[in-house]
Amino acid sequence: VFNLRPGRSWRHNPSYASELARLEGDAVRKFDGARILDVLGIEVDGVDIAAGIGEAPLCEMVDELIQAGLFLANGDPAAQATVGPGPTQLVLEPRGEDVLLTMISLRPPARILAGGLLVDRQRLRKAMVGAGQRVITDLLDVNADLRASDWVQRITRDLRQLSRAATVPAQPWPPEGSKQAGFVAKSVAK
């Protein structure tokens, strides 16, 4: 099971909510969500691997996840997205029908926070689309005029593309003839 849960506590912050509700005209068009800080839950098999990481710009995190999803759908060998402060990055590497997740903190000393997690590619893509749709719905609940913002329009377009994208067939892992096989055993001889 895999789920992305964009934080929603920002909606209860009077500063964010009143500022968003008052946006109009050119300010709506220029809205990019950069001031909205919240957490992003990343749930793998019932465990939130991002628990305790902290708040970061929510719209930026969701945007980067959607872009990473588009890169993977286009056959890129890897993608990454900011998922927390520091920055904390989620690295995504296709492995057949799955995607290998590694979460790293680049705050010195850089370290791996979670790794070796395989997630079904289609579930990952659905979770990315769902997270983006939830953030847009929450924004529009506060100010429906935000529908006209460049950011919301671009993200909506990207979500449509991601949800419809035919995934480029993933290469088998490890690639045939790879000298990187290291710890990958194809068979065990007795």
Where are these regions (language model features)?
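N-terminal low-complexity, intrinsically disordered segments
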Residues: 1-60
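An exposed acidic His-Trp-rich patch
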Residues: 76-124
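Charged/polar positions within long, soluble alpha-helices
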Residues: 70, 74, 104, 137-140
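Mixed-charge, glycine-accented linear interaction segment located at domain edges/termini
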Residues: 110-176
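Generic structural signal for well-ordered, non-transmembrane alpha-helical segments
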Residues: 63, 97-100, 126-133
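Compact, well-ordered interaction domains used in eukaryotic information-processing assemblies
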Residues: 52-84
